[in-house]
């Protein structure tokens, strides 16, 4: 895995961009979604504070085929793993993301759970129940979740 070690329930979507993974993760339009990155190598340019779309990651998690820890970019400040940990965001790696994208494009978005293998049986049952109960993105007030707060 990559990022924060935790389990989440969300809608699975995909992104086919070859670059811009940091911008995608911090894009508020991905709120309450787990992003499947179709491009196989994610993390090659690291992350930095200039390329944020917002101050936090609104995606619930990400799926990456092959993460790259050793970034190659003079502007980079953190690798992707550290960036995800800092933003409390989990990820899973080693998945055939292109196959998953084909499946999603044919069948539509799915509600899924990204589960940490270290979860105990009771917590795993709670996650399964959360997945059953989660109603998806429909009727969620996402604007309230992603909007800046009045000061």
How would you name each of these model-derived features?
Residues 1-151:
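RNA-binding accessory domains that recognize and position tRNA/RNA substrates
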